[in-house]
Amino acid sequence: YYTVLFGVSRALGLPLERPK
């Protein structure tokens, strides 16, 4: 789940590193 969000955020180019 975390990996998916990380991949999506990275694909979108968002400054998200670790969602609370």
Swiss-Prot record:
User: What's any GO biological process attached to this entry?
Assistant: tricarboxylic acid cycle
- Kindly list the GO molecular function terms attached to this UniProt entry: citrate synthase activity
Q: Give the disulfide map.
A: none
- Asked whether the UniProt record includes Transferase among its keywords, one would answer yes
Additional facts recorded: Citrate synthase is found in nearly all cells capable of oxidative metabolism.
Subunit and interaction comment? Homodimer.
Which superkingdom?
Eukaryota
Which family is this sequence assigned to?
A: Belongs to the citrate synthase family.
Q: Give the keywords, sorted.
A: Transferase, Tricarboxylic acid cycle
Annotated protein name in UniProt: Citrate synthase
Q: Which reaction does it catalyse?
A: oxaloacetate + acetyl-CoA + H2O = citrate + CoA + H(+)
- Biological pathway: Carbohydrate metabolism; tricarboxylic acid cycle; isocitrate from oxaloacetate: step 1/2
Q: What class of enzyme is it?
A: transferase
E.C. designation(s): 2.3.3.16
Is Transferase given among the entry's keywords? yes
